[in-house]
């Protein structure tokens, strides 16, 4: 039988793909590369490194490239550094070179340049827009160990912003707790996280202990918008309503209080 494979060892290899006049170049290096000229599939094994001209780099131990579909697939543990220096860790990740999207339907961890981690069940990464999307059970753990649970999120690498819906946020940072019994948390319709802090839309804040199955905490602050400013160390509320056992007590058009890291502040 005629051998349909070409084998290349320990050398970089360039894959040129194009639909029209413009070619997108992928740079592949591995300990061993095999080319199947009949199926037009390239197999790479051993210290595989694949990069595009946007400087997205895929690291894995085994991968294949289907020239017909312009699809790269990794097998097993995979590490990706995006052009904006975000890190993706997961398994069995795909790179659709035709659509310019990197995606996975298995659990992955995305780490941004500030050390915040996003745990996903699936993700799509648009390499042209530097934008992630994920849905399902999405957990964000920031660099202070605070947790945010979303049903879906968008991550904008360029603006360094995370936007998500159906958020439940648990602040585990010790500075947010006045005693061990406090469990500060924000529940909201949506939220976005950036370098300035966190903003919640149509949210509720309380520090009462979380009681699974209970309808309401002893007290809570409900507001149209809640913003925690890291720079000013202050929590701001718009159209806030103080509730005691879910019964409305006071309404404040605007309201703010010092953040938990502030011990004393004159005025209110």
Write out the residue ranges for each language-model feature.
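Bacterial N-terminal signal peptides
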Residues: 9-18
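Bacterial N-terminal signal peptides that target proteins for export
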Residues: 1-9
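Compositionally biased regions
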Residues: 5, 19-22
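Structural signature for solvent-exposed beta-strand/loop edge elements and short helix-capping sites
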Residues: 23-268
């Amino acid at each position: 039988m005629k051998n349909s494979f070409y084998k290349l060892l320990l050398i970089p290899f360039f894959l040129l793909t194009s639909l029209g006049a413009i070619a997108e170049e992928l740079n592949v290096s591995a300990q061993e590369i095999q080319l199947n000229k009949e199926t037009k599939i390239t197999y790479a094994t051993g210290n595989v490194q694949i990069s595009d001209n946007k400087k997205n780099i895929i690291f894995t131990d085994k991968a294949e490239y289907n020239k017909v579909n312009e699809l790269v697939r990794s097998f097993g543990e995979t590490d990706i550094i995006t052009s904006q220096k975000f890190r993706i860790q997961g398994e069995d990740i795909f790179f659709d070179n035709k659509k310019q999207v990197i995606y996975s339907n298995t659990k992955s961890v995305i780490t941004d340049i500030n050390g915040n981690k996003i745990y996903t069940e699936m993700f799509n990464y648009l390499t042209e827009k530097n934008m992630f999307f994920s849905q399902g059970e999405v957990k964000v753990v920031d660099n202070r160990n605070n947790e945010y649970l979303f049903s879906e999120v968008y991550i904008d690498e360029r603006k360094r912003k995370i936007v998500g819906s159906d958020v439940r946020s648990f602040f585990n940072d010790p500075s947010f707790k006045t005693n061990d019994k406090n469990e500060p948390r924000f529940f909201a319709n949506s939220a976005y996280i950036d370098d300035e802090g966190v903003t919640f839309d149509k949210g509720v804040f309380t520090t009462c202990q979380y009681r699974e199955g209970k309808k309401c905490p002893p007290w809570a602050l409900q507001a149209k918008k809640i913003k925690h400013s890291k720079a000013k160390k202050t929590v701001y509320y718009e159209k806030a309503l103080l509730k005691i056992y879910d019964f409305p007590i006071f309404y404040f058009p605007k309201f703010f209080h010092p953040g938990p890291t502030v011990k004393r502040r004159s005025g209110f």
